[in-house]
Structure formats: structure tokens, C-alpha cells
From Swiss-Prot:
It is found in: Cytoplasm. One of its GO terms (biological process) is aspartyl-tRNA aminoacylation. It comes from the Bacteria. Residues 199-202 are annotated as: Aspartate. Its EC number is 6.1.1.23. It is an enzyme of class 6 (ligase). Belongs to the class-II aminoacyl-tRNA synthetase family. Type 1 subfamily. HAMAP family: Asp_tRNA_synth_type1 (MF_00044). This is Aspartate--tRNA(Asp/Asn) ligase. ATP binds at residues 221-223, 488, 540-543. Homodimer.
Length: 596
């Protein structure tokens, strides 16, 4: 028999009854039932119930073991009685009668429990992450993450992609987030950077003729901590394709990601045909470029119904500024004054003046609008709004007014709040879509100039002609995001592979041809030697896994994450370097300036 085990703790079945076996694992818990000891032994695969009765030669040792000790048990497999069968366990029809127990490793008193969902401070859990990872939910999440990545590799191979790895030590990139820098010992005073993404390398692979590339790529960004992103590093399914339009990318990756979601969705419905929603339409209907389509609320403009109306606040805004619009947020089943007042109070708590509203109720056979706005604009306009929005008895509608460029985010938050408060959101499904036709440029209020709205390497729609002859703020890009349940899970574009068009695009944001050559020299040079039309995307693995397992926090799907202060409490990073290391790197730390 093997030194440590003949079976795992999830392997034994009724067919093994009568066999003498050996298992090893962690003591999950010990229970004393009338002098008979029951030990739940746990390993990576599952749990087996072990019985040590007073007549067993192993009983004396069984009395000494404690939770999370690592032990080996030899014993006889017996069938459980019918009334003790546990159908929730894979091994629930048997139990192992211990004949010999060996302690392989004792455990000190635990700083936190390893079963259930402990409400322990996050820093304690991260410091003792090796214990936290023993929890069933977290352990299962990590295994699921690995399975999802394996499925991604399989599916990408099935549609003709090949995995290539790109360098981890690379040049610092001036665009995007702050780089993590790595000093060079051989070239004092110079630095490598950890890649924020393999963007330029994957495009160079297309120029080199590799056609369909992918990798499970680690990405590093020195960003301030955010709730929806792990500090330091994250992983993405990175891909690039040659001789493609954006429709080719959508038609390849939409079905592929649907199959991934269906494989791990545990029966929840998954969108098969992803809608393609233009960016402007997404902002107009949902107040967000990453809409949660499980929420059925669709906003509409109702400006005409308030123009010249008796509600002087809205009517005056419309008359004085052509940019002003009134957006309606329909809320089916929200037609009670209590709910409307609750939404109004919520709006005020976010710093807004409030939310105007109308709700409808039947008075006898007549359907009437109620609330201050209904009284001010009159019955005819109120009914016209109700008809346009398809509302009825017991429904409500909220209104946001002003320049949509300034209020759309709040309108989107109000849509989300109403949908959640009224339980309109079906949480047991995965709604996926493409957001397309992003603006190529945007106006930077901070710098008072035109800047890139998203990816500067995207191809502008209309190409060089658009850059030379259009208002830059009207130019769209061949750029797209994939969205699931209100989360951006991917971003991609058709790339700008023309040197002339590339320079023209950067000139719009104030960079010269020399700046382009200095900052993106490798890519710029490559495009002068025959670059195929190409495009791709990057899918966020961490976020996809978080959605699939229903985790609320990215730390629940990551092995050894940092805390919100970007510290690895388990390994003690970051930490000061030894003086000899700093001398080798020609570096002298400068203490930060203390703020008064």
C-alpha cells in the first residue's frame, strides 16, 4: 500500500465496502457521540467520515487529534445505515472504521476558522491566506478559475489560435496607467517596465505573420486600489487576429465566450446572440457604456412633453439651452408615493437636487397621474408620457434634466437603483452584449485639449480622411467592449496599422511624428514593412471568474492577492531592499517629502 494513501477523501463509494484502505488529509472536525469519535477527514478532493470506536486500536490516538492536524488513517470501509446516509456528500454512503492513525503534522491553534464563511478582518485572512484557502468556497473558486482558464485555452485552440508568450520585462509605456519599473543592474540609471498589457507585442506578432495569437497574459499596473480591480497584477485572455474586420472578432469571440459561460453557468441562461449596441445608444438608454441588460428599464427622452409646459423649471431649462434634454426612467410596479419618496431621498444623498416623478393609479375607471410634476404639466402631457413609455396602473417614472453629457452617469445610477429596489433584475442569468462605435477622441477639461477617449492604437472610422476633414469629437473608432451583467469583461479594437494614419491621430492630441517615433518606435517602424489589417481584444479573466462563481470580491477568486493598500501581508511585500542590492543597482532611496 502507498505510504500515504490508496484513495483520496472523495473516492470511496459503496462498492468499496469491505476494503481496507488508507487515506490522508486534514482533520476537518471531530465529534464525540456517546464515546464514539467521528472524524471528518478532508483533502483537496472532498471529505470522508471516519469512525473510531472505543474498541478500535486507533481510538487512543483519535482522542488526541485536533482540527487541521494532518493525519493518515488506515481502516475498513463500511456501509452507513440507511438513516445515516448523507446524500450531499460524494462519500455519503460509507464511513471508514479506523484501525490505525498516524499524525503527520500537528497544527497550532488557528488564528481564524477554515470552515464556513468567517466574518474575519480581511488583513487577517490575507496574512494567513494558506489557511483561508482551505475554506470550501474559496478553494472551490480557485479550482473553478483554473478550469475556466483551461477551457479558454481549449476553445481558443479549437478555433485556430496558437498561444505565444510575450516578454515580461519590457519598455515603459507613456500611455495608460503608471508602470511598475524594474531597475537595470547592467545599465545603471535605466529601467525596464512590467507590461500593462501585451498590446504592442501582439501587434508585432501580426506584422511578423503569426495570424492568430492568444495568451493568458499577466498585466501589471501601478494604480491606486479600486474595488473592481486587484492592486498590482491581473490576468487577461489576450488575443489578436490578422486580416479581420470587427465583425470577424465579434463572430469568433461571442460564440466562444458563450460556450465558456454555458460550461460553468450551472444551468443559468446565457445570451447566445450578443446584441451590438452603439456607444451613444447605450448612454441614451442605460446611462452607461457597460449596461446590465438583466434590468429591463430603458430610458427615453421626453423633452418635447416638458417644452413650454407648466413645469417652469424644466420648461425654462429647455428654452434657455439647446443642449438640455429631459430623460425619463420608467419604473414598472414603482407607483407608490413611498417608493418615489425613497428614490428622491436616495438622489439627494448622492448630491443631486432630487428626482422628479410621476406615478399612475386608477381612480374608478380613470387612470390618473399623481405627484407635483403631473399637476404642473397637466393631464394631456402626463398621459402622453405614460403612453410613450408603455406604463399603466401602479407604475412610476422618474425624470432627469440638463445636459446629458453631465447627467447621464447619474441617470444610469438611478436606473440601476430603481431596478434593484423593485426586484426587476433577474440575477440568475448572464446577459452579454457588445458595446460598439466608441468615440475616438474626447475633450479633456483638465488639459483643455482633445485627447484619446480610449485606445490610441485603434483605427478611426473613416481612416485618414476622417482625421483630416472631420471635427475630431465626431469621429468614431473601430473599438468595442464586451459587457456581462453590468461589468466590462473585454475591450478590443481594429488596429491602426497605417504609419501615416497613426501619426495623424497622435497629432490631434498634440504629439508630433517625432514623439510617435520616440514613444512607439518599435510599432511605428514595423508598420513600414508590410503590416496586415488586424484587430483583437482582451478578456478579463478575474472578472469573468468572479461573475461565474458569484463572488462579491476579486480576492475571492485569486490565490494570493494584495490588500487594498497594495501590500502582500503573507510575504511581507513591498519591503526595503538591502543596501548591497541598492548599490548594485546604483539607486539611493529618497524619503518622501512630509506634508504639513
Amino acid at each position: 500500500m502507498h505510504r500515504y494513501r490508496s484513495h483520496t477523501c472523495a473516492a470511496l463509494r459503496k462498492s468499496d465496502v469491505g476494503s481496507t484502505v488508507r487515506i490522508s488529509g486534514w482533520v476537518h472536525r471531530v465529534r464525540d457521540h456517546g464515546g464514539v469519535l467521528f472524524i471528518d477527514l478532508r483533502d483537496h478532493y472532498g471529505i470522508t467520515q471516519v469512525v473510531a470506536d472505543p474498541d478500535s486500536p486507533a481510538f487512543q490516538m483519535a482522542e488526541t487529534v485536533r482540527g487541521e492536524w494532518v493525519i493518515r488513517i488506515d481502516g475498513l470501509v463500511k456501509a452507513r445505515t440507511e438513516d445515516t446516509v448523507n446524500k450531499t456528500m460524494a462519500t455519503g454512503e460509507i464511513e471508514l472504521y479506523a484501525q490505525e492513525i498516524e499524525v503527520l503534522s500537528a497544527a497550532k491553534e488557528l488564528p481564524l476558522p477554515v470552515f464556513g464563511e468567517p466574518d474575519y478582518p480581511e488583513d487577517v485572512r490575507l496574512k494567513y491566506r494558506f489557511l483561508d484557502l482551505r475554506r470550501e468556497t474559496l478553494h472551490r473558486n480557485i479550482v473553478k478559475r483554473t478550469q475556466v482558464i483551461s477551457a479558454m485555452r481549449r476553445e481558443m485552440g479549437n478555433v485556430g489560435f496558437t498561444e505565444y508568450t510575450t516578454p515580461i520585462l519590457t519598455a515603459s509605456s507613456p500611455e495608460g496607467a503608471r508602470d511598475f519599473l524594474v531597475p537595470s543592474r547592467i545599465h545603471p540609471g535605466t529601467f525596464y517596465a512590467l507590461p500593462q498589457a501585451p498590446q504592442q507585442y501582439k501587434q508585432l506578432l501580426m506584422v511578423a505573420g503569426f495570424d492568430r495569437y492568444f495568451q493568458i497574459a499577466p498585466c501589471f499596473r501601478d494604480e491606486d486600489p479600486r474595488a473592481d480591480r486587484l492592486p498590482g497584477e491581473f490576468y487577461q485572455l489576450d488575443l489578436e487576429m490578422s486580416f479581420v474586420t470587427q465583425e470577424d472578432v465579434w463572430n469568433t469571440m461571442g460564440p466562444l465566450m458563450t460556450s465558456i459561460f454555458e460550461e460553468f453557468a450551472e444551468g443559468k441562461p446565457v445570451t447566445k446572440e450578443w446584441p451590438r449596441i452603439p456607444y451613444d445608444e447605450a448612454i441614451r438608454k442605460y446611462g452607461s457604456d457597460k449596461p446590465d441588460l438583466r434590468n429591463p428599464i430603458v430610458m427615453q427622452a421626453v423633452t418635447e412633453h416638458f417644452a413650454g409646459s407648466g413645469f417652469k423649471v424644466f420648461a425654462g431649462m429647455i428654452a434657455s439651452n439647446p443642449k438640455v434634454e429631459i430623460w425619463a426612467i420608467p419604473a414598472k410596479t414603482g407607483g407608490s408615493r413611498a417608493f418615489c419618496d425613497r428614490m428622491n431621498a436616495w438622489a439627494q444623498s448622492t448630491g443631486q437636487p432630487g428626482l422628479g416623478y410621476i406615478f399612475w393609479r386608477k381612480e374608478g375607471d380613470k387612470l390618473e397621474g399623481a405627484g407635483p410634476l403631473a399637476k404642473n404639466i397637466g393631464e394631456e402631457r402626463t398621459d402622453a408620457i405614460r403612453t410613450q413609455l408603455g406604463l399603466d396602473d401602479g407604475d412610476a417614472c422618474f425624470f432627469v434634466a440638463g445636459d446629458p453629457a453631465k447627467f447621464y452617469k447619474f441617470a444610469g445610477e438611478a436606473r440601476t437603483k430603481a431596478g434593484e429596489e423593485l426586484n426587476l433584475v433577474d440575477r440568475d442569468r448572464f446577459e452579454l452584449c457588445w458595446i460598439v462605435d466608441f468615440p475616438f477622441f474626447e475633450w479633456s477639461e483638465e488639459d483643455k485639449k482633445v485627447d484619446f477617449a480610449h485606445n490610441p492604437f485603434s483605427m478611426p472610422q473613416g481612416g485618414l480622411d476622417a482625421l483630416q476633414n472631420q471635427d475630431p469629437l465626431t469621429i468614431k473608432a473601430f473599438q468595442y467592449d464586451a459587457v456581462c451583467n453590468g461589468f466590462e469583461i473585454a475591450s478590443g479594437s481594429i488596429r491602426n496599422q497605417s504609419p501615416e494614419t497613426m501619426v495623424a491621430a497622435f497629432e490631434k492630441v498634440g504629439l508630433s511624428q517625432q514623439d510617435v517615433e520616440d514613444r512607439f518606435g518599435g510599432l511605428y517602424r514595423a508598420f513600414q514593412y508590410g503590416a496586415p489589417p488586424h484587430g483583437g481584444a482582451a478578456f478579463g479573466i478575474d472578472r469573468i471568474v468572479m461573475l461565474l462563481v458569484g463572488a462579491k470580491n476579486l480576492r475571492e477568486i485569486s490565490l494570493f492577492p494584495m490588500n487594498q493598500q497594495a501590500q502582500d501581508l503573507l510575504m511581507g511585500a513591498p519591503s526595503p531592499a538591502a543596501p548591497t542590492q541598492l548599490r548594485e543597482l546604483s539607486i539611493r532611496p529618497i524619503p518622501p517629502v512630509k506634508k504639513d
